[in-house]
């Protein structure tokens, strides 16, 4: 078996890092995790527009990011021996191929195509929700009101989840845990961070995600991850507490 090393940003905040980490962990893969930090994310950002504005912050140079293990400037990156795989969904695809017994995609071809479709929708969509509801596993923001555009994204997520669960019968989107669930886990986390009520049709799904051993392990690992100033400052600017949901 090749050596697997997943290079991530802090699992406290990085939704793109959480996704393949969950897929690999659920699959039972043996892999090491290396956490890197980007210098520009420890600076002071502008939050006056209700989002994280990095316009006036000089980004960490591409050469520095590559020195940390990136391929094209972003993280995560999975190294299979010395071969890098970048992009979260591609890493999840590798996990599905390398560990077929984990069932990370549905067996039925049509359901597998649907699972891939909603995973791709997560990659390319929901821009307003991602901008306004910055991912923060342990933070909580009381009294938060999403913008109209963000609410549209939230409504679409509930529509999508409800349709999948009605068809599959649960407990996960396609019956058993799949890459689709890994892709949407950070959305569930975001909704909790900002106090967005869950649609009644997805309450049991949320509980099934909470009970998943890979998710419980992620929360345990993430609480020890390095802090990112910009994300903590953003929650404070909204009147929130970055540590409100820390265990213990």
Label each region the model flagged.
Residues 121-122, 212, 225-228:
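A short structural micro-motif
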Residues 42-45, 210, 228-229:
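Short Asp/Glu-rich motifs
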């Amino acid at each position: 078996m090749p050596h697997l090393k997943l290079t991530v940003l802090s699992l406290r905040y990085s939704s793109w890092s959480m996704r393949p980490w969950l897929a690999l962990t659920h699959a039972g893969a043996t892999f090491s995790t290396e956490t890197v930090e980007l210098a520009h994310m420890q600076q002071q950002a502008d939050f006056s527009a209700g989002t994280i504005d990095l316009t006036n912050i000089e980004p960490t140079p591409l050469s520095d990011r590559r020195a940390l293990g990136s391929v094209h400037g972003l993280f995560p990156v999975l190294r299979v021996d010395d071969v890098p795989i970048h992009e979260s969904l591609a890493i999840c695809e590798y996990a599905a191929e390398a560990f077929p017994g984990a069932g990370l995609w549905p067996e039925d071809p049509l359901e597998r195509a649907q699972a891939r479709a909603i995973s791709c929708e997560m990659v390319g969509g929901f821009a307003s929700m991602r901008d306004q509801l910055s991912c923060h596993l342990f933070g909580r923001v009381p009294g938060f009101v999403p913008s109209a555009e963000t609410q549209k994204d939230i409504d679409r997520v509930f529509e999508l989840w409800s349709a999948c669960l009605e068809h599959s019968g649960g407990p996960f989107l396609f019956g058993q845990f799949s890459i689709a669930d890994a892709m949407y886990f950070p959305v569930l986390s975001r909704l909790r961070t900002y106090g967005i009520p869950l649609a009644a049709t997805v309450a049991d799904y949320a509980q099934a995600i909470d009970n998943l051993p890979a998710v419980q392990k992620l929360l345990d690992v993430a609480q020890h991850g390095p802090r990112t100033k910009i994300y903590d400052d953003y929650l404070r600017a909204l009147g929130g507490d970055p540590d409100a949901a820390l265990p213990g």
